[in-house]
Every structure is written in C-alpha cells, then in structure tokens.
C-alpha cells in the first residue's frame, strides 16, 4: 500500500529554493539534502517505489505547493539525494489547502519531510491529488 509524503524543496536548509525547484521540475525528481544517517534523510531513503510525494514548503496556514509525483527510483545515495518521479504534476496553480486538521496542525515549524496519515481525514483529502 502506497504511502504519502510531503517534502520541502529547501534542500540546503537555507531558504534558497529556486535553483533546486527548477532542477526538480526539469528532471521530474525530488531532492533531499539530509543524508540517510540523519532521521529526515532516513525517511527519504526508506520511501518505496510507488509511494507518492508532494513538494511543498511552509506552515499549513500558508503552505506553498509546487508539484507531486510517484516515486519511481531508489535513492541516489549521493548528495544531493535524489529520487525520480513518474506521473509528475505541477500543482502551483491548484487550490490545495492544508489546515489545522492536517499533520502538524497550526504549528509554525514543519519538518523537511513528513508522512500524511491515512487515518487523518484532512490528510486523506490531500492524498486525493495523486
């Protein structure tokens, strides 16, 4: 059964996302700066082919959503850690709303990667966009 993840495009954790976003759009990939030895990098490394990702950043109340796709490759295991995506969809103009009922609710700090929960109705609504 597929799992659903939200991943920040802030690869170097410095707020500068434009170059990485352009590269991810051009190559239909998702990238992570954390190594598999780090908790966040381990989650990225353990994703399975057939899982879905949404590339987005920010707190739920003002989340910027960029694209989504299905994981179609293993982790590159080289920095930048990279996974290829199929079914790549540009979501920049879509009205997808994350709110207080989604994972991490009203928190101002959202992890660089997290899993949407299938037992959370609000998260399930987001998963419909795959």
Could you tell me what each predicted segment is?
Residues 47-48:
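Short, well-ordered loop/turn sites that connect or cap secondary structure elements
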Residues 64-75:
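Short beta-strand-centered aromatic/proline hotspots
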Residues 1-16, 27-32, 36-40, 77-130:
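Contiguous surface segments at macromolecular interaction interfaces
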Residues 57-62:
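Short, charged beta-turn/beta-strand-edge "cap" motif at the junction between a beta-strand
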